[in-house]
Amino acid sequence: HTDNHYRELFVRSVKSVAYALNNVVIKCYTGMASPACVAVDELFGDMMLGSLAGDDTIIIVTYNEQDSESLTRELKNLLA
C-alpha cells in the first residue's frame, strides 16, 4: 500500500483528533477505528510508543506531551 492509500483511509474513517498529556484520542465512524489505526501506524509509527483501536476510538500513547501535540497536528492536517 502507498502512503496515499493510508491517507485516504484515514480521512474517510476519522471524525476528530485530540490529545491529553502523552495520549492522542482519535474518534472514528463506527467500525472504522481498526482500519484507521493501521493507517496511523503505517504513516506515523515512529512518533508513538503504540496504539490500540476499539470499534470507534483509537488511543495512541506517545513518548511525551510534545510528541502528542505534534502527532495531533499532523493528523489534523490530513483532515484539513
Region annotations inferred by a language model:
Residues 2-72:
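Non-DNA-binding regulatory cores of transcription-related proteins
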Residues 76-80:
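Ferredoxin-like alpha/beta domains used as RNA- or RNAP-binding modules
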